[in-house]
Amino acid sequence: MKKPLLFFSFQILVLLLVAQPYVDPFQVRYTYAFRSGGNSRGTPFTHLWAGSDLPIKIKNNTYLLLSPFYENWQIDSASVKNIQPTVHSIALPIGLIVPLKNKKWTMVINPILRTNGEELFAKNTFQLGGVGFFGYERSPGQKIRFGAYMNSDFFGFFFMPLLGADWKMDERNYFFGLLPGRFTWEHKFNSHLFGGMTFRAITNSYRLNDGQYLRIDDNQLSTYLDVYPAKNICFTLEPGYGILRKLRTGTEKKIYTTTDKWGDGFFIKLSAAYRVRLKK
């Protein structure tokens, strides 16, 4: 009985904490952006991300969701390798579900501690931020979420309101996410094949060894195909296009010494995950 009860508690936790129909106890993603010509002159880069979601029950109706992750950016130019130094990040988001009296409402607090830089754990590489949002269940399978993201970025205090949904349209179509961070449409072809479209907005800053910071902005629109060769194993192929990209460096908050248009362009993302799909 212990295994089914553990899985049931795991499902309840994730249903409350995440706006998606699945959870990944482990996932790794690799993105390769192609060089492009024309006016946009897309800059090639690689991005590696690896992370997990680890649930912990601390007392009745109160849960933690630890979501540590690592990422790595390598950015090139048309003629020069590593136009910017390789930068890394290690982050520890800690999601806390706070029970409310009205069962239609949930509140989630998710502080995030991270080290971002050319060297990890070096001086002036630490950032503190977080996400907080409320969720309201209009009806079974229809949830609305709203809140805010904030972070002590090296370019200054970053604040962004959030609005999202966790919406099961029918047995095959699902919309989920929090904008402007990420929003996804998922379509179920069969139990082994899912697909759809995803939008991601990325804003991060990293401390360089010369004391400056690097700010990375990207907006990615992509289609994807999830293949499940086994129940909990998922491989993803995700081609897409990045727009309104910018690379900026600076030494003081809100003051940039360089601003480069990163260049719009195509990318391909490959992912592998141990995934638990949730019954919603």
Where are these regions (language model features)?
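Outer membrane beta-barrel transmembrane domains
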Residues: 175, 192-257
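Short glycine/proline- and aromatic-enriched beta-strand/turn motifs that initiate or cap beta-hairpins
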Residues: 20-78, 277
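Sequence/structural signature of outer-membrane beta-barrel proteins
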Residues: 33-37, 71-80, 99, 112-120, ...
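Transmembrane beta-barrel strands of outer-membrane/channel proteins
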Residues: 26-32, 66-72, 109-113, 146-150, ...
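Residues that define the transmembrane beta-barrel architecture of outer-membrane proteins
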Residues: 44-50, 84-90, 122-128, 157-161, ...
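Outer-membrane beta-barrel "beta-signal"
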Residues: 162-168, 225, 262-280
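Residue-level signature of outer-membrane beta-barrel architecture
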Residues: 54-58, 96-100, 136, 167, ...
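Repeated loop/turn-to-beta-strand initiation elements of outer-membrane beta-barrel proteins
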Residues: 59-65, 102-107, 141-146, 172-175, ...
